[in-house]
Amino acid sequence: MASLQEANGSTAWPPPTASNISEPHQCLLLLYEDIGSSRVRYWDLLLLIPNVLFFIFLLWKLPLARAKIRVTSSPIFITFYILVFVVALVGIARAVVSMTVSASDAATVADKILWEITRFFLLAIELSVIILGLAFGHLESKSSIKRVLAITTVLSLAYSVTQGTLEILYPDSHLSAEDFNIYGHGGRQFWLVSSCFFFLVYSLVVILPKTPLKERVSLPSRRSFYVYAGILATLNLLQGLGSALLCANIIVGLCCVDATTFLYFSFFAPLIYVAFLRGFFGSEPKILFSYKCQVDEAEEPDMHLPQPYAVARREGIESAGPACASAANYSSTQFDSAGVAYLDDIASMPCHTGSINSTDSERWKAINA
């Protein structure tokens, strides 16, 4: 058979294999191509720059943040500030380590573990915001914060372990390039399922105020909470669409998930800061999760008397006697400026016969003697 093929001047082609999107493409080259002759990848540099800038911003705001934290009794703000700080540090560490590792198998595993650690912290903050906002936002106590963090830690750890196991033990061959296995977020199928799940969760949060459920439970009234949920719902929707295209072996989907991955791992921590911490570290700290609109109390009615009546009352006091006038003057200088009108009226009442302020008080002295 082989001789027949050689005689015909042709060779036997191997059977067609499944379409692999690891063929050179701009969206794929971005993930693993190095800058010049260095081992620094464009992808790692793109993720490093926003995290470094945000970390510098946090350091710049650190003196003000420490001063605000000292005078606050809310553990929610302290917890969120620490978590945002940690996420920025982990993002920087992941990018720096990825820049220094080689293309060996051990280095690839280390890089994927750093990706999972970063994802773990980001997901923990995601779940903490949702749980605190919907269930425990009105309980700003250390015990409630610890319970929320414990729940989010367990859930985030389970998610990250599952994703890491799929990524390391069962890497997606469609997300590999040359001799370097690119981090694939657990594979196309896992990426699609998780993106759809989080899209449904955040979409439900956004529409909650429009449902009859708002009459039965207390929902956050801050607009920034729902803007935060809406942004993440949109991000997960785009990520799900990109993953679906990858499952259909359409390489354009890789460009979509590249964009969503960059936005999530670079700007999620700043999103948390702007949505929930900027008001706290501003000039006037605001409540993180408010559950009803604050109604200002009605202004106190002006207790001071009209000017004509006040003049007439003053003349009556002066005619009543010097002692009573002295008491009125004392009242005016001590209390009028402070707005305590009730004490002013008592002290400036006309003096009656037999009162302590009248001239008949001499008989009280005789009795006491």
From Swiss-Prot:
This is Transmembrane protein adipocyte-associated 1. Glycans are attached at N20, N329. Pfam families: Tmemb_40. The keyword Ligase does not apply. It is a multi-pass membrane protein. Keywords: Glycoprotein, Membrane, Transmembrane, Transmembrane helix. Induction: Decreased throughout ischemic hypoxia and reoxygenation. Its main location: membrane. The gene is Tpra1. GO terms for molecular function: G protein-coupled receptor activity. The chain crosses the membrane at residues 45-65, 73-93, 120-140, 148-168, 189-209, 237-257, 262-282. It is found in: Membrane. The lineage of its organism: Eukaryota, Metazoa, Chordata, Craniata, Vertebrata. InterPro entries: TPRA1/CAND2/CAND8. GO terms for biological process: embryonic cleavage; G protein-coupled receptor signaling pathway; negative regulation of mitotic cell cycle phase transition. PANTHER family: TRANSMEMBRANE PROTEIN ADIPOCYTE-ASSOCIATED 1. GO terms for cellular component: plasma membrane. Belongs to the UPF0359 family.
